[in-house]
Every structure is written in C-alpha cells, then in structure tokens.
From Swiss-Prot:
Domain of life: Bacteria
GO molecular function, one term: protein transmembrane transporter activity
Cited Pfam families: TatA_B_E (PF02416)
Keyword terms: Cell membrane, Membrane, Protein transport, Translocation, Transmembrane, Transmembrane helix, Transport
Protein name: Sec-independent protein translocase protein TatB
Ranges of biased composition (kind: Polar residues): 132-142
Complex formation: The Tat system comprises two distinct complexes: a TatABC complex, containing multiple copies of TatA, TatB and TatC subunits, and a separate TatA complex, containing only TatA subunits. Substrates initially bind to the TatABC complex, which probably triggers association of the separate TatA complex to form the active translocon.
Sequence similarity: Belongs to the TatB family.
Function: Part of the twin-arginine translocation (Tat) system that transports large folded proteins containing a characteristic twin-arginine motif in their signal peptide across membranes. Together with TatC, TatB is part of a receptor directly interacting with Tat signal peptides. TatB may form an oligomeric binding site that transiently accommodates folded Tat precursor proteins before their translocation.
Membrane topology: Single-pass membrane protein
Biased composition (Low complexity): 117-129
GO biological process: protein transport by the Tat complex
C-alpha cells in the first residue's frame, strides 16, 4: 500500500504531523493510531478464522487473496494445466508468420514464393521434390521502379469558404 512512498515524502509527512498536532500531542496520537491498526488487524484475522471454521475441512486450503479478481484470473490462466486450450489460441496468433507475410507483400513477393525461397535457402528438399524452382534474381519488368515519381492527380476544386459558418 505504501510501497511508493520515498524518504522525502515520509520526512514531509513527519514535519506536517509535528506542525499540525504539535510535539506534545504527537506521541499520544501515534499510540492511538497504532492501537487502532492492531485492533483492525485482529478483527480481520478473527473474521477470516471464523469463516474458515464455518466452511469446514474441505476449504482448509482456501485463500482470501484468491477472491481478488485479478489474482483469481492470473492463477487460473497462468497455472500449468491448460484445460481451456489457451496454448492453441496463443500459437494461432503467431506474429512472426504474420509479419513475414506483410514484409513479403511489401516487397512484392507472394507468400508461396517466399516460402519456397526460404525452404531452398534452409536446405530443405521439399521445393526441389515438387519441381518448382524460384529465381532469386531481379527482373526489370516485374519489380516496380520506386524511385520514379508517381503522376500527380488533378486535385478537385475546393468548396467556397464560408466565414459565417465557422
């Protein structure tokens, strides 16, 4: 709860407490606050024990921290058993394959040609067995000239400016 309070903030709170309550009332106030916190903890612990005793022996491994929705979901999903098939879903969203498909599309290659080129580079005999050969040299008519400027299209007329409308 107070993990993000630094030394400077703690010192500032101490100085403010001395200024607000005064040095003569501060020790009594600290004792009252610590006594109240202890009573709250005792009440909480006794309530937890009462609930555990009323639930019976089948719930002896019950943890109240599991009632927090974040920890419940984290415990159920990150546990070792994969009853819901989440591993298959994670594998179906393989981003490496999608990124390679996008880069192939940007480079102007089809995904089948890139798969054949990748298998030929990796030394796989699957491409040679199919009888499909892929040339890895560039040909002038198939690759677009990216350095050439695209012809500019005629821009449509702008609508008239209406000063009263703005």
């Amino acid at each position: 709860m107070f993990n993000d309070i630094g030394a400077l903030e703690l010192l500032t709170l101490g100085v403010l407490a001395v200024l607000v309550f005064g040095p003569d009332k501060l020790p009594k106030l600290i004792q009252d606050v610590t006594r109240t916190i202890r009573k709250i903890r005792e009440f909480s612990d006794s309530a937890k024990e009462d609930i555990r005793s009323e639930l019976g022996p089948q719930f002896k491994d019950f943890e109240f921290e599991d009632l927090n929705p974040k920890t419940f979901v984290r415990k159920q999903l990150m546990d070792g058993n994969d009853d819901l098939g989440l591993k298959e879903i994670r594998e179906s969203f393989d981003l490496r394959k999608e990124i390679s498909d996008v880069t192939d599309a940007v480079n102007g290659r089809t995904p089948a040609a890139s798969d054949t080129a990748n298998s030929a580079v990796n030394g796989s005999a699957g491409a040679a067995a199919d009888g499909v050969t892929t040339s890895l040299t560039k040909t002038g008519e198939t690759t677009p000239d990216l350095l050439k400027k695209a012809p500019q299209q005629a821009q449509p007329e702008r609508p008239p400016f209406d000063a009263d409308a703005t």
